[in-house]
Regions:
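Residue-level signal for inorganic ion chemistry
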Residues: 76, 97, 168, 248, ...
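Short, intrinsically disordered, mixed-charge
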Residues: 52-57, 90, 115-120, 170-178
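Short, structured patches in soluble enzyme cores that scaffold and shape functional sites
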Residues: 80, 99-103, 144-147, 157-161, ...
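Glycine/acidic-rich beta-strand-loop module
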Residues: 55, 59-88
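The conserved catalytic core of RNA pseudouridine synthases
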Residues: 131-162, 166-176
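Short, glycine/charge-rich beta-strand/loop segments that flank catalytic centers
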Residues: 64-73, 92-94, 126-133
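Accessory RNA 3′-end/elbow-binding domains used by RNA modification enzymes
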Residues: 1-62, 130-135, 152, 175, ...
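Acidic, low-complexity central loop/insert segments
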Residues: 81-129, 149
Length: 320
């Protein structure tokens, strides 16, 4: 992680807010996200509903739907965090795909076509998709060929959110003139969530909830449910003064004098996360200056706040 640029120095009042990892357990669950390893079989919405019943919460929601036959990383938000999870919809994704060619061809042709289908591509969503079927541009960041076994081609693909891998395989088959289809698919990354130690199964969550409710052991559930802040770790950040927090929670944009620290290399118009000194997520917005401009500014709005995630009055009102 790049070292933050210091614009100003400030202190935080320990009487307000808290470190995201130290929230009381009820608040931790209600503001939490789960990096779930979705199994093959249920729909993403069925998994949401199952988690809602298990945890006895009001609301659950996922970021980036996986089809029933697809497994892997499915981030799920709980209660207030369902709004944070929506920030993942456009985030980069990674998949491991098994594509089945309808005829056997040379490895050279396979490598060439994967190279051809890297960069900007055109896609029309499949007939069964939940979105309007319009031609759209998607970016394929890179494709790694992992293995070829006869007509089966295993590859890893990093792509823009909203890319349809099933359609990607179909279009490759069309371009080759032999036909192809997606045989198996697993998502290995969604924004900041990967197949690391935070990835948990439905059984892990069931066991953790048992330990919490029957043995008063919080540790397993805290390992399964992450603070909402985990869902936006892929975004660059701006740290603000305590005095700026409540005004943002009431709809104000972020002014220059409220900023303490910021990530380097922030671009004009980039979506950033806005955090307290303690590391709590206040909201997210679009910058009106780059890092250098923000650092040198003495006045004016620096971030147009688009989403607020923190409850008002978590920090004291210091604005008029």
């Amino acid at each position: 992680m790049a070292e933050l640029l210091i614009k100003s120095v400030g202190e935080t009042d320990p009487n307000y807010g808290c470190n995201p990892n130290e929230r009381p357990i009820k608040e931790h669950i209600s503001n939490g996200v789960v990096n779930l390893d979705k199994p093959i079989g249920p729909t993403s919405h069925e998994v949401d509903a199952w988690m809602k019943r298990l945890l006895h919460v009001e609301k659950t929601g996922h970021g980036g739907t996986l089809d029933p036959k697809v497994s892997g990383v499915l981030p799920i938000g709980i209660n207030r965090s369902t709004r944070v999870i929506q920030m993942l919809l456009g985030a980069p994704k990674e998949y491991v795909c098994l594509m089945r060619l309808h005829e056997k061809i040379s490895e050279t042709r396979i490598r060439d076509i994967l190279q051809e289908f890297t960069g900007k591509i055109f896609q029309t969503p499949p007939i069964k998709s939940a979105v309007k079927r319009e031609l759209r541009v998607r970016t394929i960041y890179n494709v790694d060929l992992l293995e070829i076994d006869g007509q089966d081609v295993l590859f890893r693909i990093n792509c823009e959110g909203g890319t349809y891998i099933r359609k990607y395989c179909h279009d490759i088959g069309e371009a080759l003139g032999i036909g192809a289809h997606m045989a198996e698919l697993r998502r290995t990354k969604s924004g900041p969530f990967t197949e690391d130690e935070t990835l948990k199964t439905l059984q892990d969550l069931t066991d953790a909830y048992y330990y919490l409710t029957q043995e008063n052991n919080e540790k397993p559930i805290r390992e399964c449910i992450l603070p909402m802040e985990a869902a936006v770790k892929h975004l660059k950040k701006i740290v603000v003064r305590d005095s700026a927090v409540d005004s943002i929670c009431h709809g104000a944009d972020l002014a220059s004098n409220g900023i303490l620290e910021l990530s380097p290399d922030i671009k004009l118009g980039e979506t950033v996360r806005v955090l307290t000194i303690k590391g709590e997520l206040v909201g997210a917005g679009e910058t009106v200056e780059n890092s250098d401009g923000i650092l040198k500014s003495n006045k004016g709005i620096m971030v147009n706040i688009k989403k607020v995630f923190m409850e008002p009055e978590t920090y004291p009102k210091m604005w008029k």
